[in-house]
Amino acid sequence: MPDNLSLHLSGSSKRLNSRQLMESSNETFAPNNVDLEKEYKSSQSNITTEVYEASSFEEKVSSEKPQYSSFWKKIYYEYVVVDKSILGVSILDSFMYNQDLKPVEKERRVWSWYNYCYFWLAECFNINTWQIAATGLQLGLNWWQCWITIWIGYGFVGAFVVLASRVGSAYHLSFPISSRASFGIFFSLWPVINRVVMAIVWYSVQAYIAATPVSLMLKSIFGKDLQDKIPDHFGSPNATTYEFMCFFIFWAASLPFLLVPPHKIRHLFTVKAVLVPFASFGFLIWAIRRAHGRIALGSLTDVQPHGSAFSWAFLRSLMGCMANFSTMVINAPDFSRFSKNPNSALWSQLVCIPFLFSITCLIGILVTAAGYEIYGINYWSPLDVLEKFLQTTYNKGTRAGVFLISFVFAVAQLGTNISANSLSCGTDMSAIFPKFINIKRGSLFCAAMALCICPWNLMATSSKFTMALSAYAIFLSSIAGVVCSDYFVVRRGYIKLTHIYSHQKGSFYMYGNRFGINWRALAAYLCGVAPCLPGFIAEVGAPAIKVSDGAMKLYYLSYWVGYGLSFSSYTALCYFFPVPGCPVNNIIKDKGWFQRWANVDDFEEEWKDTIERDDLVDDNISVYEHEHEKTFI
């Protein structure tokens, strides 16, 4: 056997499998007679035997208990490092990949279309959605005008979610990885860090809001004056010992659910989806019955705006729905990557989001109107209505009803916190420190930080804080616009997976510079954010800050402005300054759609082969060479 075909069990970093050996042997031997052909077949048999023996030896070595030179090294390798498969690679290579960042293999792609229906049925039942109609009603719209804006707003939301989901459905990628295609390998950390910060803050705020249904459950069991029976030694002017106890109960009860793998968390949403209809319609029927069948819909608004005032009230109500959903649009690939087929996350989301959220908002409107008929006050929060029920009629039936509905609200907040905050934070943290943090650790980090930032102080400081959280949609919409333009217009659905996990020279997504920055994405992002900044500052800043009416109106349209400007400016920049790895020469005139259903079950082997190469320049010769035979969709 020639030397170049011998298999040596040495410390070489190059890996050689049987297929590569046989390909090498095909180049070395060119049998042109019977004797040479016999020798060739004999050599192939020897190769196979040696490869088998090598494999057996490696399995035996790997099964032996590893030896560490010190106790601290054992701690480091056994408990600090989360992905042992990337121990032998460089620091930069380990940043590219871990088990939570890799494309989702077939075994974990278990979400069918009905799982997405259950997911959104579960998501629509939360405290924020019940109150979303208050924006339009307080601006002067009547109930049916407000409901129309909700249908339209969530219709747009459904479309944006479906667009953002597509890259996850086809290539099985999470947002931190898919954003590398548009922002660049390393500059993609900017939107990722944005999501981490917002996820932690929102997790903390949502957990603090969930303290109220926990409080209602406790009062249903131990008495409506329970908060007066617990001495206040907390030492904070913004929260009592009782309030912190309720917050901590919810926070601690959430921790086990943070350890559930993302592809299995669908079971939580299935359970939640079963409970939600009973709680929603049960609450509505109960409220109407207590109001003796009367609903004071006319009490929901005082004045009716006309002309341009009505138009802007209509638009602001519509935009409130979209801003409320800005985080979930960005998060869409984190869930769509688990879909069984490309269409599992398509029609189910496009139809369910506007339908389910609009029904929930209508129930919220009717419960508020029934509450006014009973108490003469518009309680926009459903929890305030339940609190009033408990305080005015403390009997067995009321206690049981309040407990059950509050329990569903608490479960709803748990599901929302996982889907919108902890899971996205865990996924993003695993992209920042893939060697040391996986989704479970990232989710627990999110929960720990949520406790540390003391949300009761944030919520008590000013209503400006909650405004700032909602207004942050101007930054998220600009990210979503860039990602959408890059995938659908510039790349026409084409992603080269080996390149998106590589920082080597020639990787499409390094954009020709060692910093992995796509300057077009940065410029487009700033174009989307800049027009809305003056209005944002005026809305969340000091009362003395004044801006023009035009600046405020741009801010009211922030989601459309941010998304539209970033989308169009990125498309224009890529037209004049083409990006690498684009399957068409002219992104405006050329036609074609190059998305494919990626087979990624053996992707780890492909990735390891890729990082052993000095560069990927040869891959730039043809976009289609290795994947043209795959099925395009």
Curated annotation (Swiss-Prot):
Transmembrane segments: 143-163, 173-193, 197-217, 242-262, 268-288, 310-330, 350-370, 400-420, 442-462, 465-485, 521-541, 559-579
InterPro entries linked to this entry: NCS1, Pur-cyt_permease, Uracil/uridine/allantoin_perm
Keyword Transport part of the UniProt annotation: yes
PTM statement from Swiss-Prot or TrEMBL: Glycosylated (possible); but there is not yet direct biochemical evidence for it.
MF-aspect GO terms: nucleobase transmembrane transporter activity; uracil:monoatomic cation symporter activity
UniProt topology in membrane: Multi-pass membrane protein
Location (main, coarse): membrane
Keywords: Membrane, Transmembrane, Transmembrane helix, Transport
GO CC, one annotated term: fungal-type vacuole
Classification via PANTHER family: ALLANTOIN PERMEASE-RELATED, NCS1 FAMILY PURINE/PYRIMIDINE TRANSPORTER
Function: Transport of uracil.
Similarity comment: Belongs to the purine-cytosine permease (2.A.39) family.
Protein name as it appears in the record: Uracil permease
Taxonomic source organism: Saccharomyces cerevisiae (strain ATCC 204508 / S288c)
Upper lineage: Eukaryota, Fungi, Dikarya, Ascomycota, Saccharomycotina
Name of the gene this protein is made from: FUR4
